[in-house]
């Protein structure tokens, strides 16, 4: 590969930057980030003149960009099946201008350059376009829908900003309808990540699509990878050259005296060491027949925690020089002649260096020989693998902490409160419909004030609620009510009281 031809290029608008160093981090647990440094050659020394306004960081930030990785090896005969280009498409989330360096005259003569170019050096962060969902926090409420539809509705706000297809074709499970799904003081990215991960759904992207999975199904041909632990791989054989296993101490079961809050598995008796079916997971349950509502608990289930624990126990770390491996891809590793195991890539960190293209960029007053600069061209990656018989289970996300109390207004069947004021409107269980003040901005911005799916039916607390006895009152349309949250859960609001005001 010619010293002046980089195997790394970053294209922003119509500008083509040569990249000298890049670190790319991607995982099924979080969106990808690429931190890179490179330069753009320009005949002008002052790149920020009026004639070069396109180089101003203000013109580069938040622009779509593509990082293109070509085969990094001199030996093109290495069988990568095809010498494909790996492309990462995202947006520029950070720009820093590092300065200008003029090429060495002596080296320019050797390279037969006909004109004097100036290298203007920049530092960039290339982020997944999903980072645009993380810029602002929002309060929203969804009723009578499931988590998949809530995710789709949230993503629909960004139809013109993602510029990638959203693919839900790998969602195989059926998700029950929730009476209430709340987003409180969360960015849209935090919200869809919490909903997805707490239900065992993960998402990732390639250059054209964003994929959602809840069950891994392999597509395409499985790549056969050689395991070669020899550090003297002078021919740059495409291989995995290191495999490591990590393990940290943790409790593996419940007992009556202690439990592991991070990884609850099956419940065991302290004395018998056998599963005790009479012992229950330490969490409150509210059955629908008693609470007049479907299960609105959006916390992760012990089953998912068990799946994640099993996945973590079978995770492997690997190092390779194979540049064309993709996230969520299945590979077969030939550890020995008769031993082949299949794995799925769940995380990848790539370190790419190509400062050999700077060979003609030295200060002529340094009297330093080019061969002493230790310039290099290299590629390596760190992989996280799980056996292919396991499905990736993402880490769990905690819910936002709700306010202690908030206000709300009882409303009726439509938005005309004045005509219905002081009348009673309930559902079949005696619950009243409330417009919660937390979500008033959502209704105003969406221009859907008092719409049904923004105003849930809530239960009303009472001093005494016994069989055939107790206190009972029903807040009327137009009443101001106090909203509290059961178990400090944003998805479990109820009416804890009412307030007099100037109207009533």
Predicted segments, located by residue:
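Amphipathic alpha-helical and helix-coil boundary elements used as assembly
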Residues: 1-504
């Amino acid at each position: 590969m010619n010293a002046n031809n980089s195997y790394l290029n970053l294209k922003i608008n119509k500008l083509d930057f040569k990249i000298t160093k890049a670190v790319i981090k991607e995982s099924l647990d979080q969106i990808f980030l690429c931190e890179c440094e490179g330069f753009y050659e320009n005949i002008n020394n002052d790149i920020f003149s009026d004639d070069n306004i396109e180089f101003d960081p203000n013109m580069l930030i938040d622009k779509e960009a593509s990082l293109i990785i070509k085969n990094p090896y001199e030996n093109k005969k290495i069988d990568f099946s095809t010498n494909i280009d790996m492309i990462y498409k995202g947006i520029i989330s950070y720009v820093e201008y590092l300065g200008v360096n003029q090429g060495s005259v002596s080296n320019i003569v050797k390279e037969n350059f006909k004109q004097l170019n100036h290298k203007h050096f920049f530092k960039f962060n290339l982020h997944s376009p999903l980072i645009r969902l993380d810029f602002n926090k929002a309060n929203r409420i969804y009723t009578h829908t499931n988590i998949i539809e809530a995710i789709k509705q949230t993503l629909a706000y960004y139809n013109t900003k993602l510029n990638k297809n959203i693919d839900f074709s790998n969602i195989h499970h059926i998700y029950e309808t929730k009476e209430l799904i709340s987003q409180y003081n969360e960015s849209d990215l935090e919200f869809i990540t919490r909903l997805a991960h707490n239900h065992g759904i993960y998402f990732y992207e390639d250059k054209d699509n964003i994929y959602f999975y809840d069950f891994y199904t392999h597509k395409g041909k499985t790549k056969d990878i050689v395991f070669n632990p020899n550090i003297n791989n002078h021919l740059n054989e495409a291989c995995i050259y290191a495999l490591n296993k990590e393990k940290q101490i943790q409790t593996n079961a419940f007992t009556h005296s202690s439990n592991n809050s991070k990884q609850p598995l099956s419940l065991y008796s302290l004395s018998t060491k056998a599963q005790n079916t009479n012992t229950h997971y330490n969490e409150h349950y509210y059955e629908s027949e008693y609470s007049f509502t479907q299960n609105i608990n959006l916390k992760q289930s012990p089953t998912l925690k068990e799946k994640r624990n099993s996945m973590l126990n079978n995770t492997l770390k690997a190092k390779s020089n194979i540049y064309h491996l993709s996230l969520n891809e299945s590979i077969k590793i030939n550890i020995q002649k008769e031993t082949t195991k299949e794995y799925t890539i769940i995380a990848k960190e790539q370190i790419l260096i190509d400062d050999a293209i700077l060979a003609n960029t030295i200060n002529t007053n340094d009297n330093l020989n080019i061969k002493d600069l230790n310039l290099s061209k290299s590629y390596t990656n760190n992989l996280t693998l799980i056996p292919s018989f396991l499905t990736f289970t993402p880490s769990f996300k905690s819910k936002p902490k709700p306010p202690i109390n908030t206000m709300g207004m009882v409303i009726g069947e439509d938005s005309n409160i004045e005509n219905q004021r002081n009348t009673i409107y309930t559902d079949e269980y005696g619950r009243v419909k409330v417009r919660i003040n937390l979500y008033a901005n959502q209704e105003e911005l969406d221009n859907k004030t008092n719409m049904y799916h923004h105003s849930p039916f809530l239960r009303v607390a009472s001093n005494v609620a016994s069989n055939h006895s107790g206190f009972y009152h029903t807040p009327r349309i137009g009443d101001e009510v106090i909203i509290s949250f059961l178990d400090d859960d944003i998805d479990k609001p109820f009416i804890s009281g009412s307030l007099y005001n100037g109207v009533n």
